[in-house]
């Protein structure tokens, strides 16, 4: 082989290798932590409904903005995701304080938000694997929605008001709500009997349309549903006797991830401090009512608060 060609080829290989190394150093520097170590890939999980998808995407956007690589692990069933994070399949995901209290840990009912948070935080940290970050004021709890016109007509703004005026109200119920202890039977124990003018069972997906069609006046609801953004049509009643526990949005994270990436606490807590119930209603409405893509909604919201 020609010696000059051999030397040229060898030099070219060295030059290419050096260039690739330089490029790698440049890219890696964007994903370096403050102590000089490369930032980890963070697996951000979500449950299989709009609100969880939007919030987890906001978390992911914030982490990427701060130099992390994010692996999105989406649409996990609510019953499965606690095991997923324990197993390391997920590093971080948005959970709810009430779900943690009653479903995950099967603890006694508590309605004070701070007490609920303290109780579940202690449970998450027991095995040294998980912990939680600050909870948001946003509360995705059970509730009762009423037509705003009816609320104004009869001065009904709390569940106590509803109980006193039940004989004027056509109730659009759902099958399980009539039997479950966290539904009508439990409400009766706390508020007294609800002698509705009428009560008809409808499919959950039809409840707001039933109210709009003037077939009923009130219905079981969740307090962050997108339809509630239409305040001219719908009003959520205040649970004035605190029958339902709070379901404040709360990030669950693996302790090992937080220990090796402590800045994640500040990144995610900065998001949660601005999240209130009305904000969640608006975010859900953009996806479920307006038909926007959840990732676009999350990106737009994150850009507005960062």
What label would you give each PLM region?
Residues 104-114, 118-133, 227-241:
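Ligand-binding "clamshell"
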Residues 169-239:
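Ligand-binding pocket segment of bilobal, Venus flytrap-like solute-binding proteins
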Residues 50, 72-83, 100, 175, ...:
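Short helix-initiation/N-cap motifs at beta->coil->alpha
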Residues 115-171, 255, 273-277:
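A conserved helix-loop-strand patch within extracytoplasmic ligand-binding domains
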Residues 8, 23-41:
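Short, low-complexity, disordered segments immediately C-terminal to signal peptides
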Residues 50-69, 85, 90, 185-189:
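Short, polar/charged alpha-helical segment
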Residues 18-22:
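C-terminal motif of bacterial Sec signal peptides marking the signal peptidase cleavage site
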Residues 37-51, 59, 68-74, 167-173:
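Short, well-ordered beta-strand elements
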């Amino acid at each position: 082989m020609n010696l000059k060609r051999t030397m040229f080829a060898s030099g070219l290989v060295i030059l290419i290798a050096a260039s690739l190394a330089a490029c790698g150093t440049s890219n890696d520097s964007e994903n370096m932590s403050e102590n000089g170590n490369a930032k980890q890939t963070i697996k951000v999980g979500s449950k299989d409904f709009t609100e969880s998808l939007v919030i987890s995407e906001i978390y992911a956007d914030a982490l990427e903005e701060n130099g992390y690589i994010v692996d999105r692990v989406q649409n996990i069933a609510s019953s499965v995701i606690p095991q997923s994070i324990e197993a390391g399949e997920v590093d971080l995901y948005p959970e709810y304080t009430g779900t943690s209290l009653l479903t995950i840990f099967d603890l006694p009912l508590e309605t004070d938000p701070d007490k609920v948070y303290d109780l579940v935080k202690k449970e998450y940290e027991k095995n040294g694997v998980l912990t939680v970050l600050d909870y948001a004021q946003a509360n995705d709890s059970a509730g009762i929605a009423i037509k705003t016109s009816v609320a104004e007509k009869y001065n009904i703004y709390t569940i106590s008001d509803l109980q006193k005026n039940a004989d004027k109200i056509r109730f659009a119920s759902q099958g399980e709500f009539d039997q479950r202890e966290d539904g009508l039977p439990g409400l009766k124990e706390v508020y007294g009997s609800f002698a509705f003018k009428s009560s008809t069972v409808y499919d959950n997906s039809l409840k707001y349309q039933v109210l709009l069609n003037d077939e009923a006046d009130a219905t079981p609801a969740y307090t962050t549903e997108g339809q509630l953004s239409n305040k001219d049509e719908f009003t959520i009643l205040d649970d004035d006797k605190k029958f339902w526990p709070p379901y404040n949005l709360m990030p669950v994270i693996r302790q090992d991830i937080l220990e090796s990436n402590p800045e994640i606490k500040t990144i995610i807590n900065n998001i949660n401090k601005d999240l209130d119930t009305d904000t969640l209603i608006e975010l859900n409405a953009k996806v479920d009512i307006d038909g926007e893509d959840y990732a676009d909604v999350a990106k737009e919201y994150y850009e507005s608060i960062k």
